[in-house]
Amino acid sequence: MSNPGGRRNGPVKLRLTVLCAKNLVKKDFFRLPDPFAKVVVDGSGQCHSTDTVKNTLDPKWNQHYDLYIGKSDSVTISVWNHKKIHKKQGAGFLGCVRLLSNAINRLKDTGYQRLDLCKLGPNDNDTVRGQIVVSLQSRDRIGTGGQVVDCSRLFDNDLPDGWEERRTASGRIQYLNHITRTTQWERPTRPASEYSSPGRPLSCFVDENTPITGTNGATCGHSSDPRLAERRVRSQRHRNYMSRTHLHTPPDLPEGYEQRTTQQGQVYFLHTQTGVSTWHDPRVPRDLSNINCEELGPLPPGWEIRNTATGRVYFVDHNNRTTQFTDPRLSANLHLVLNRQNQLKDQQQQQVVPLCPDDTECLTVPRYKRDLVQKLKILRQELSQQQPQAGHCRIEVSREEIFEESYRQVMKMRPKDLWKRLMIKFRGEEGLDYGGVAREWLYLLSHEMLNPYYGLFQYSRDDIYTLQINPDSAVNPEHLSYFHFVGRIMGMAVFHGHYIDGGFTLPFYKQLLGKSITLDDMELVDPDLHNSLVWILENDITGVLDHTFCVEHNAYGEIIQHELKPNGKSIPVTEENKKEYVRLYVNWRFLRGIEAQFLALQKGFNEVIPQHLLKTFDEKELELIICGLGKIDVSDWKVNTRLKHCTPDSNVVKWFWKAVEFFDEERRARLLQFVTGSSRVPLQGFKALQGAAGPRLFTIHQIDACTNNLPKAHTCFNRIDIPPYESYEKLYEKLLTAIEETCGFAVE
């Protein structure tokens, strides 16, 4: 007769389900791992392996195994990179968890559990990160079908409310805050009071002292309308793009200097090697301190000039609540100030140099040393000489088919026809084009043709609204003709003094100028790749990397290999040839499958704007010439606004500016586009807004009309007509409705 007690103490049959892993460590600079999980029952020799998942840090397996577990047995679940396991003993290890015998009984039948991955041993040098999700079920409780589980939901409850985890194209994890509309690389954590046992992941070694927590009752950390989430992401991209649209950013501090802030918010600079501190910004030469401030233009938004009790001027940054003695405009515009000083020195030298018998040998002020506004003025003069005195470039399109109809008409024309005065008409609308309709056309068209939806372009990064050519654009058989069209439109915008609403990466503009690309250009486009390549150059890679002169590219899910040089797959990267490898890699990264597309775009652009006219500009200046200023300076807007039938003290005017200051950057841009036809500001600021017959300031016109009417815009005259609304709330509501809902032109 069998003994029930003896049977109960024998091996127990359990079903282990290995569902997925998350946030695995990325050990290769340029490739993602091929993870698989290995299950070993220590003591009995049972061993199982999951399938291999290609190129991911978040593999999903959902595979189960029936295990016989003895009383003293433990289970080790390890994760490995299939690409590396054949290299040497222990290669490819990505982390493991070990379930001790007494913890197995407590894990059993508790649903899916999240376990932190850890090292094989405490002295192991391998970097480990991430979690694995598993479940243990008694064999007699296993049903005919398993529960379908969304792996992503198992991890969401670790994040604070309103946060979302995303992954960039290079595999790096970033965190999106939907409340503040910001992104960051560091994983956000909940306050201590928010942590509770159901949300805490398990330790990698699980024993009787480790609390067992389930995920069945976990709630998703962020749930929202997908359309709202997409709108928030686009708004974030828009803000990030516009915040970077400046001519030149302040240069880095000299080596050995650090910028610090006192407890009172005063900014100072410390030389770490000598311990000497100073209030003066070391990036700015001291002889520039007495420069005329009017030459530098207005202060940045949120800054104010004040005087100390002794009369010394200092600057208050209300954005960061700090003060400093150095004018913030000096560091941002240092290149212009130095250029201007060099120009004056050259002029002084010319005055003391005797006249040369040959005029060609006389000293002149180099054109490239003039500031951007002067160079742009010269460009406009040279372009105006090319414009025919008679005839028009007439284009009639519908708003619904603006992309295709514009493409067909523009591509039919000869390049010299595109130089004629631009006359745009929207079908079914009676607007006369004195500039405003053309600005509206370019605004709408640029939104369409640059939209990644059409496959011609793609976002360069997940967190900023800059574009690059899509290497897989060939899915459209006519893609080269469309790139030719895009180049023509960009050239037409520059030629006729308008702007494209959108922007590319700075290396794109550099290539458009015919300049070579360097490693430094990679930093803004792909920071992770830039850091990896810099690390290769600055460190001895002997025995560390096993790369060859062959790189991989993911094209719609298919992994394609590209050799950087002939037979590159068999040429290892060594300490001796690593500089060549980095140079070839950078060139391939920026021209990866886009050579033909870029040449077609460049051809269209140069058909309208000859390349020799752009030799004096750098890539940042070219970006501003094509796209204008994205950052809207409300102070400059106010100063350069004309009032008609109202005064600065009129309620309509005060309420209008109150609404503008309340708007975020995106709504300010929409308001500007509603009134002027373009969301971009000229390089010289609002004083350079163009109307039907030359410069025309932004105009607020109070009209005698029913207060139930919406404000009305006259884009050809940069004028907005506003009825005498009874309250700020009504003006705000009507103004918002007008800029969000209305479109179309009419003739009065």
Swiss-Prot record:
Q: How does it assemble?
A: Interacts (via WW domains) with SMAD1. Interacts (via WW domains) with SMAD2 (via PY-motif). Interacts (via WW domains) with SMAD3 (via PY-motif). Interacts with SMAD6. Interacts with SMAD7 (via PY-motif) and TGFBR1; SMAD7 recruits SMURF2 to the TGF-beta receptor and regulates its degradation. Does not interact with SMAD4; SMAD4 lacks a PY-motif. Interacts with AIMP1. Interacts with NDFIP1 and NDFIP2; this interaction activates the E3 ubiquitin-protein ligase. Interacts with TTC3.
Q: Taking every annotated instance into account, which residue ranges of this chain make up the domain WW?
A: 157-190, 251-284, 297-330
GO BP annotations listed: negative regulation of transforming growth factor beta receptor signaling pathway; positive regulation of trophoblast cell migration; protein ubiquitination; ubiquitin-dependent protein catabolic process
Note on domains (UniProt): The second and third WW domains are responsible for interaction with the PY-motif of R-SMAD (SMAD1, SMAD2 and SMAD3).
**Which pathway?**
Protein modification; protein ubiquitination
Induction notes from the record: Up-regulated about ten-fold by activation of the TNF-signaling pathway in vitro.
Protein modification: Auto-ubiquitinated and ubiquitinated in the presence of RNF11 and UBE2D1. Ubiquitinated by the SCF(FBXL15) complex and TTC3, leading to its degradation by the proteasome. 'Lys-48'-linked polyubiquitination mediated by TRAF4 at Lys-119 leads to SMURF2 proteasomal degradation.
Q: Name one Pfam family in it.
A: WW
Q: InterPro entries, alphabetically? A: C2_dom, C2_domain_sf, E3_ub_ligase_SMURF1, E3_ubiq-protein_ligase, HECT_dom, Hect_E3_ubiquitin_ligase, WW_dom, WW_dom_sf
**Residue span, C2 domain:** 1-119
Q: Where is the protein found, in the record's own terms?
A: Nucleus; Cytoplasm; Cell membrane; Membrane raft
Q: Which SUPFAM superfamilies match?
A: C2 domain (Calcium/lipid-binding domain, CaLB), Hect, E3 ligase catalytic domain, WW domain
UniProt key word DNA repair: no
Q: Which GO terms describe its cellular component?
A: cytosol; membrane raft; nuclear speck; plasma membrane; ubiquitin ligase complex
Catalytic reaction equation(s): S-ubiquitinyl-[E2 ubiquitin-conjugating enzyme]-L-cysteine + [acceptor protein]-L-lysine = [E2 ubiquitin-conjugating enzyme]-L-cysteine + N(6)-ubiquitinyl-[acceptor protein]-L-lysine
Q: Where is this cross-link: Glycyl lysine isopeptide (Lys-Gly) (interchain with G-Cter in ubiquitin)?
A: 119
Keyword Transferase assigned to the entry: answer is yes
Gene name, please?
Smurf2
What Enzyme Commission number(s) appear in the record?
A: 2.3.2.26
How its function is modulated: the record gives: Activated by NDFIP1- and NDFIP2-binding.
What name does the UniProt record give this protein? E3 ubiquitin-protein ligase SMURF2
- What is the organism field in this record? Mus musculus
Residue ranges occupied by any HECT domain in the UniProt entry: 414-748
